[in-house]
C-alpha cells in the first residue's frame, strides 16, 4: 500500500467511524481511483464514496530562517453497510 500513509484518529474521525467512514492520510500525488483500488484490494471492502482535502504544511524555524513541512492529503473513505476495516495495530514502544 504505497499511497496510504497512516490512519488518522481525531475527534472528527472517531465520530465518523459510527457512519462507517474511515480517515487516513495519503501521499499528496495519489489519485482517488488509486486509493480506492488499494483500499478495496488490501482490506477486501467495497468503497462507495471518497472525500479528500489537502492540508497545509506547518512552518518550522531553522535558526534565523523559516522553513516549512510538506503539505499532505487526507481522505475520508465511506464503505458500504456491512463492511468494516479491522482496527489497526499499535506500534510497540
From Swiss-Prot:
Where is it chiefly localized?
plastid
Q: Which Gene3D superfamilies match?
A: 3.30.70.330
Matching entries from SUPFAM superfamilies are given as:
Ribosomal proteins S24e, L23 and L15e (SSF54189)
Q: Molecular function (GO) terms listed?
A: mRNA binding; rRNA binding; structural constituent of ribosome
Taking the record's annotation, the residue ranges forming a coiled coil are none
List the subcellular locations: Plastid, Chloroplast
Q: Disulfide connectivity?
A: none
Please provide, in alphabetical order, the Gene Ontology terms of the cellular component aspect for this entry. chloroplast; ribonucleoprotein complex; ribosome
PANTHER family found in the cross-reference section: 60S RIBOSOMAL PROTEIN L23A (PTHR11620)
Q: What does this protein do?
A: Binds to 23S rRNA.
The protein's assembly and partners: Part of the 50S ribosomal subunit.
Q: What is this protein called?
A: Large ribosomal subunit protein uL23c
Q: Which organism is it from?
A: Fragaria ananassa (Strawberry)
| Recorded name of the encoding gene | rpl23
Amino acid at each position: 500500500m504505497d499511497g496510504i500513509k497512516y490512519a488518522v484518529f481525531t475527534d472528527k474521525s472517531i465520530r465518523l467511524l459510527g457512519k462507517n467512514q474511515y480517515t487516513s492520510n495519503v501521499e499528496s500525488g495519489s489519485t482517488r481511483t488509486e486509493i480506492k483500488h488499494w483500499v478495496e484490494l488490501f482490506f477486501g471492502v467495497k468503497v462507495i464514496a471518497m472525500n479528500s482535502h489537502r492540508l497545509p504544511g506547518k512552518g518550522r524555524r531553522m535558526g534565523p530562517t523559516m522553513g516549512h513541512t510538506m503539505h499532505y492529503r487526507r481522505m475520508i473513505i465511506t464503505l458500504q453497510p456491512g463492511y468494516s476495516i479491522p482496527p489497526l495495530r499499535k506500534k510497540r514502544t
